[in-house]
């Protein structure tokens, strides 16, 4: 089977969507599934206003339709709700082709953080976008419950995976900062709510890994925080394992891949009780969640690091691929036996 992934998020972006697509595509090979991608990289692009790191494709519905037809794929999966996703959806509906979608990003909250756009308007549009397909993949039960309450239908379970061979506790070393070390990894952007972490009165050191549009501003505002910028994957694994607690201040993520990377490294996680953290560590195993983020961060210092590692072991890319293919097969009305 050949599947076309249509995504407005792609390299050189470094984010959870791109990482998930890369790992899912690689894992699907063992299911005898070949994936192709339609991304902004083959078009002229325009930076997204207020977020220049994201490039939007400048093209037409007719060209997108021709490109999809030329790929001769068995199924179209729409990953994002940007220009390419919108045009691919239009093509599928006009051609009478079944398609599936993913709900990766809480765009209504992202938009309202930057522009005076009511969240209700954005959710209404997203509901119509996703409900017109044959299935929408969501990574957590709490997200599914929230979207269902907003009128989304055809929601299908998904998950995320983590490379537990790469992210592991034995990579722990001395980072050279006073302990305990509180770490945060991710895009340095307004929707990630980093000041909620950086404003906390915590002992030891705060360390932030990642790039983004807010980096210069936050560096100036928080001179005592260690901002390390982007780090290669090998070095990132060492940093994860060397922290004493991982703090996840975002309230708008739909999962939080960095959470399970930290857990796989044996580092307990502190977060708000919101979608993603509540699903992964809401039972107190592997971390702590609280509306008082400082309380959660301090509590995480006392969480068993072996338990954190064990919690990460339940997340695999094979399970993610199996859930993905089940949704695709439902959309196509097939019951193919997947390769082992």
Where are these regions (language model features)?
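Conserved donor-binding/catalytic core segment of Leloir-type glycosyltransferases
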Residues: 174-207
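Aromatic "clamp/platform" in nucleotide-sugar-dependent glycosyltransferases that forms part
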Residues: 251
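Nucleotide-activated donor-binding/catalytic signature segment of Leloir-type glycosyltransferases, i.e.
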Residues: 216-235
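Donor nucleotide-sugar binding/catalytic pocket of nucleotide-sugar-dependent glycosyltransferases
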Residues: 124-170
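A charged, aromatic-enriched C-terminal amphipathic alpha-helix characteristic of glycosyltransferases
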Residues: 302-339
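Short hydrophobic beta-strand element within catalytic cores of glycosyltransferases
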Residues: 264, 268-271
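Nucleotide-sugar donor phosphate/pyrophosphate-binding loop at the beta->alpha transition
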Residues: 98-100, 109-128
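Short alpha-helical donor nucleotide-sugar binding micro-motif in glycosyltransferases
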Residues: 130, 231, 238-243, 324
